[in-house]
Amino acid sequence: LASGTLLAPGEFFSGLRKELKARLPAALRSFSSARGRGRLMKLHYGRPEFHYEAWHHTGAGRLEIGLHFEGSAVENQEAFDFFRGHMLEVKARLPRAELEPWDRGWSRLYETLPAPQLDEGVLDDAAVRMADYIATLQPLLDNLKKE
């Protein structure tokens, strides 16, 4: 498909799952994923409250890629503090990543990509960025779980 070929949300997120399985190291390919309402996909490695998310903000024309902390207030604060302490390491691999408190006591470590519409070009960019986020952040998240 050409770069400008428009994709329905279902096609886009199905394609993103397939691309991630192809791009991720073998040890990170066995994620659980679910579509959220609208233009949203979440994936995780056994803790759904700490999940990676791809979310198309249609009004802003942006696609958010990131790691969301949506557990208890205590868990979210622990995760926020842990990743704040690792931001130099994170920024070395994900230079546009931002860590911020968010809605309902949640927080997120994310960036946005231009996405006026969902097409093959956005899918390619999203797959690269999301694979980078997972490969960079999941080992850190695994360390957080051990502490």
Task: Annotate each PLM feature.
Residues 90-147:
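Charged, low-complexity intrinsically disordered regions
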Residues 2-106:
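Polyanion-binding interface signature
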Residues 1-3, 146-147:
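Polar low-complexity intrinsically disordered regions
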